[in-house]
Each structure stands twice: as C-alpha cells, then as structure tokens.
C-alpha cells in the first residue's frame, strides 16, 4: 500500500542524507573541503 511506499522512500532519503553527512564529515576531518 501507500504506507509501505512512503516508508521505503523515507528509508532511501534517510540513507542518502546519512551518506552525504558522512562525506562532509570525512571532508572536514581530512581538511580537504
């Protein structure tokens, strides 16, 4: 149903946000921004 679609989309978005946050953290830590 719609709820499962929304949950899947939410997980996908959350994963992308987490990945980009990790990338920016690594960038700041390594000083390569």
From Swiss-Prot:
GO BP of this protein: defense response to bacterium
UniProt main location, coarse: secreted
InterPro entries listed in its UniProt record: Antimicrobial_frog_2
Tissue: Expressed by the skin glands.
Pfam families reported for this sequence: Antimicrobial_2
A GO CC term attached to the entry: extracellular region
Cell location: Secreted
Disulfide bonds, paired cysteine numbers: 27-33
Keyword Disulfide bond set for record: yes
UniProt keyword Secreted, yes or no: yes
Keyword field: Amphibian defense peptide, Antibiotic, Antimicrobial, Disulfide bond, Secreted
Top-level taxon: Eukaryota
Family listed: Belongs to the frog skin active peptide (FSAP) family. Brevinin subfamily.
Function: Has antibacterial activity.
Name this polypeptide is given: Brevinin 2AV
